[in-house]
Amino acid sequence: MIAFIQEIQRRTPLGWLQLSHHKSRLLVALSGIAFADVLMFMQLGFQNALYDSNTRLNRAVLADIVLISPQSRNMQNLATFSRRRLLQAADVPGVKSAESMYIGLVTWKNPQTRRKTSVQAIGLNPEQLALNIPEVNNQLDKIKLPDHFIFDRAARGEYDEVFSQIDAGESVTTEVDKRTITVSGTFKLGASFGADGTLISSDENFLRLFPRRQAGSINLGLVSVQPGYEPKQVAEALKSYLPNDDVKVLTRAEYIKMEEDYWKTESPIGFIFSLGVSMGFMVGVIIVYQVLSTDVNAHIKEYATFKAMGYGNSYLLGIIFEEALILAILGFIPGFIVPLGLYQLAANATNLPIYMTVARALIVLLLTLIMCILSGAIATRKLQSADPADMF
């Protein structure tokens, strides 16, 4: 190992010398790599925001096992099933409780701007804890009142005046699907790609927003398991006991994964973000290849001279790969810094969870290294054909 390090120290950094000799060409190359990195960072950031924002409610549900309709695709497209299945589920050994939850999209009028937008309405039993959101659990008495709701203060839109009124102890009235409601409290959950915010109230108030819905048709069944029982074991018992053509039994982890898988594989927007990452990678490969190919053509006589002096192809290839690694590392630095500001800008504009993570930075760095090494491998094909006899 020491001998290898000493050999590296004695070696002339020809790759760096050749790149730095043409500073304008180097700057163009680094700009291209940084652009490719920014494109990959932004697509991965949006993709993560897609998964994160659309699984927030799934992760906030207080349940060991979740019952849904087999026709349900995601949280924005939840079918209903009979509430009787909860009563049947309560008879299965290991089940501590089984509560219902109603979920649906409604059109609500922003009390401040008077503009209409889509928000997700949730109806739950105010006598039981259904969500792992302390702000909601502390205001269950408020939502027992007729037509009283609490609203998501992390919703997308202009609500500063509304939240100031509520924080001052005042109630705010507005319309939801042509019905007047009172907003008497707030909590924090966040917007998603499917809804600009969330309204929460009692199951009775929810059903008033949906007069055509039957109280016996629910969207979610929240099952809690007794101490000493494994959720997976109880879930298997529920699958055997309940008709699988009418209700689908999921553990908490499976319930979250179902939502994420929908946006990954079935949603067009998930495919678009993945395609964007691939396009960024290909743009980087093309840019780095053009730079390295131009460098090989410009110094083909020098490379032929090295061959005439007895240096093998491996030495010459090492120079090209040295250039590729230098370009990858130097190009990654601005490619990492710029998205930090863009993430903050996008998060403020959309209220979506867009932020940098260490894992994502390492992934893009690895992709950048692969991108540059791949470009170097393509560019070296011409180098191997450099023949001193043809040059001189």
Give residue spans per PLM region:
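N-terminal Sec/SRP start-transfer signal
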Residues: M1-M40, Y51, R56, F321
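Hydrophobic alpha-helical transmembrane segments of multi-pass inner-membrane transport and secretion
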Residues: K23-L50, E266-A304, I326-F332
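Membrane-interface junction motifs in transport/secretion proteins
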Residues: F35, F46-R83
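The feature marks short, hydrophobic/small-residue-biased sequence motifs that occur predominantly
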Residues: R83-L87, V92, K96, S100-I150, ...
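Basic-flanked hydrophobic alpha-helices used for secretion and membrane insertion
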Residues: L131-N132, R153-L250
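Peri-transmembrane interface segments
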Residues: P231-V285, T294-A298, F306, S314, ...
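Transmembrane alpha-helical interface segments in multi-pass membrane proteins
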Residues: G280, S293, A298-A347, I363, ...
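C-terminal membrane-exit region of the final transmembrane helix in multipass inner-membrane proteins
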Residues: I354, A359-F392
